[in-house]
């Protein structure tokens, strides 16, 4: 009788302890859509640059983890006078950020991001071409949902200021938790 009681108590304790470590040492990877809104001195681009976002997250323990993010957006422009094309331009935006993540419960995690952003503009009109680029700090925040144990839905916003150009990027993705 004592052995049965001891064994059942031990099994109950181990099962409770295993529920508390549901997130430790787990990883997730997600890929998704990114769209930047570019603004300078009150003016915005006619078409927002679009691209992709890739995130990797590692959970250190039940609550805390780290997350890394890479985002890329691009938009090409053609310049016309009437129906005649006389030039072309490209806007590219890259960012690499990382930061802490905090798991609120089994389904929801919040995170913050800090890192670097790089913007590049190239244009060629007739026989002339110009380009400019700038690297600056980027920061953001996001949320990850785990509606199923191995499925991740990710949503985040990132902001950077490249001299007088302000870039805000929304990202929405899905991925796998393992």
Swiss-Prot record:
UniProt-annotated location(s): Cell outer membrane
Signal peptide: 1-23
GO terms for biological process, alphabetical: symbiont-mediated suppression of host complement activation
Highest taxon above the source species: Bacteria
SUPFAM superfamilies reported in the protein's UniProt record: OMPA-like
Chief location: membrane
Membrane topology qualifier: Multi-pass membrane protein
UniProt keyword Translocase present: no
Cellular component per GO, a single term: host outer membrane
Protein family per UniProt: Belongs to the outer membrane OOP (TC 1.B.6) superfamily. Ail family.
Function: Promotes the invasion of pathogenic bacteria into eukaryotic cells by an unknown mechanism.
Identification of the protein by name: Attachment invasion locus protein
């Amino acid at each position: 009788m004592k052995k049965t009681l001891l064994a059942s108590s031990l099994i109950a304790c181990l099962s409770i302890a295993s529920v508390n470590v549901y997130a430790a040492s787990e990883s997730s990877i997600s890929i998704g859509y990114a769209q930047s809104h570019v603004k300078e001195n009150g003016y915005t681009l006619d078409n927002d640059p679009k691209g992709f976002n890739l995130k990797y997250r590692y959970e250190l323990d039940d609550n805390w983890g780290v997350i890394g993010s890479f985002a890329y957006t691009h938009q090409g422009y053609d310049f016309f006078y009437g129906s005649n094309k006389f030039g072309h331009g490209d806007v590219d935006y890259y960012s690499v950020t990382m930061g802490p993540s905090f798991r609120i419960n089994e389904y929801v995690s919040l995170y913050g991001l800090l890192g670097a952003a790089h913007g590049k503009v190239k244009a060629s009109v007739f026989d002339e071409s110009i380009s400019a680029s700038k690297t600056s700090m980027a920061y953001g925040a996001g949320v990850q949902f785990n509606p199923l144990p191995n499925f991740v839905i990710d949503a985040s916003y990132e902001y950077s200021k490249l001299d007088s150009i302000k870039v805000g990027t929304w990202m929405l993705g899905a991925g796998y938790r393992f």
